[in-house]
């Protein structure tokens, strides 16, 4: 709960949290090492000195610390767990729905669990999405369009395969589509996070909400034009918020 200077209490739902494991023991290859080191560099450069973590602590977020950060010392009342699989880089994935579900199971009244899908997984992926939705009663998914999968280094929401998955999500009652469209982390490709494909699917799927995580950075202007036009497009401000402190001008 956040209390304003006037004493007003505001119920806080944190829309973007990750319960990750980027530790050396979980790294599958050099790319896993590159990813967590770049991720840590963002943390180091955008956090106040008093809030900077040691690298070993940052590499693998433990459940006790996460709960205390969010709900004891932090202002959160509830939080949405957003998965980021990256199974080409990490043996057990970086931050899977399964890993997140352990947090949800331990603290069911505190966490909202989102799932994920990747249209490159074909019919098997559609079956998995149905099973995931049935198991966890999903209302949202987190998509990572720049994720590497074999020789593929990303996909677009406007691809035909993506349409099949969005249609399936709609039928399953998965209304909130969270899409990472923000700063690139090594070794992922910047252009694979281009926000332009949101425009197409937002028009085609009016009953879905598209939450553009990190509001399209570094393509903020493009995002703003799309969000102005499309009434079902919203900004997720994670990562964007720290820039207010680091670059207030």
Language-model region placement:
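Helix-coil boundary/capping segments in enzymes
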Residues: 1-249
